[in-house]
Amino acid sequence: MVNDKLIIDKKKFNSRLIVGTGKYKSMAECAKAIKLSGAEIVTVAVRRVNISDKKKPLLMDYIDPKKITYLPNTAGCFNSEEALRTLRLAREIGGWKLVKLEVLGDKKNLFPDMIETLKSTEVLTREGFRVMVYCNDDPLMAKRLENVGACAIMPLAAPIGSGLGIQNTTNIKIIRSQTKLPLIIDAGLGQASDAAIAMELGCDGVLANTAIAKAKKPFQMALAFKNGVIAGRQSYLAGRIEKSIYGSASSPKTGII
C-alpha cells in the first residue's frame, strides 16, 4: 500500500482519512485524536476556530500546519456571500488556496444549498481557489460541480452529525463511475464500519468529525476510523467476489473419499 496515495490538487497524502477539528472538549483532545487517526488533512471552520487571535489559544499551537494540511471550510455559512467572504478571509490569514466549501440551506437538517454551492464554486475557482465541495448525493449536480472547476467532490452520507452512515450507496456508485476527481464521503458517518463501506464503494477518502469527537472514547474511535479506512481501501483494491443466490463449495470436488 506504499504507493497507494490520496492525491488532491497534485499533492500526495498517505492517509485517506480527513478529520474535522470541531466539537472536541479541548484543542488538546482534538490534537491527540488527530494524531491517533493518522490524518494528514484537517478541516478548520474559519468562523468558529481561532486561527488568528494571538490573545487566545490558537489551533496552530496544537496542530502544526507545517506537518498537517489545514483545509479551511465555510461551516455555518448559509449563502454564497458568507461563504465567499469567509474563504477570502482564510486566504488573507494563512494564504490558503485549497479550501472546503459548504453552503447550508437549512438549519435543522444542514443539507447543502446546491444552487448557492454551485455559484460559489464557480466564483472561487475563477479567483484561483482549489475547491473541495460538500454536496448532496445527486450525480447530476456532482457533474456540474466538476464542470465549473471543483477539485474534489464531497457528497454527504447522511445529514451532518447524524451518525446514520451511508444512506444511498447507489448514488455514490454512480458518482464514482462518472468522475475521476477525488471522491470523499463527507458528513453523517457514525462508526468505523461506515468508513470501510465508503472505501469499498470506491471512494478516495472519508471525512469524520462528530463520529470521533463525540464518541464515548474519542481516541479509540480515531484509531478505529484509521483502521476502517485502511481495511475498506484494501478490500476495494482486492476486488470482492461476485454475489450469487447459490452456494459454492469451498472444498475441492476431486479426491473425495
Curated annotation (Swiss-Prot):
Gene Ontology terms: biological process:
thiamine diphosphate biosynthetic process
Q: For this protein, what reaction is catalysed?
A: [ThiS sulfur-carrier protein]-C-terminal-Gly-aminoethanethioate + 2-iminoacetate + 1-deoxy-D-xylulose 5-phosphate = [ThiS sulfur-carrier protein]-C-terminal Gly-Gly + 2-[(2R,5Z)-2-carboxy-4-methylthiazol-5(2H)-ylidene]ethyl phosphate + 2 H2O + H(+)
Question: In this record, what's one Pfam family?
Answer: ThiG
Positions binding 1-deoxy-D-xylulose 5-phosphate in this chain are G161, A187, G188, N209, T210
Which keywords does UniProt give here?
Answer: Cytoplasm, Schiff base, Thiamine biosynthesis, Transferase
Its Gene Ontology cellular component terms are: cytoplasm
The Swiss-Prot or TrEMBL record annotates one GO molecular function as: thiazole synthase activity
What EC number(s) are associated with this protein in UniProt?
Answer: 2.8.1.10
Q: What InterPro entries does this protein's entry cite? A: Aldolase_TIM, Thiazole_synthase_ThiG, ThiG
Question: What are the positions of the active site?
Answer: K100 (schiff-base intermediate with dxp)
Name where it's found: Cytoplasm
Which pathway?
A: Cofactor biosynthesis; thiamine diphosphate biosynthesis
The question of whether Transferase is a record keyword is answered with yes
Q: Where are the transmembrane segments?
A: none
Which EC class does it fall in? transferase
Q: Which family does it belong to?
A: Belongs to the ThiG family.
Q: What does this protein do?
A: Catalyzes the rearrangement of 1-deoxy-D-xylulose 5-phosphate (DXP) to produce the thiazole phosphate moiety of thiamine. Sulfur is provided by the thiocarboxylate moiety of the carrier protein ThiS. In vitro, sulfur can be provided by H(2)S.
- Which PANTHER family does this chain map to? THIAZOLE SYNTHASE
Quaternary arrangement and interactors, per the entry?
Answer: Homotetramer. Forms heterodimers with either ThiH or ThiS.
Write the protein's name. Answer: Thiazole synthase
- Organism in which the protein naturally occurs: Pelagibacter ubique (strain HTCC1062)
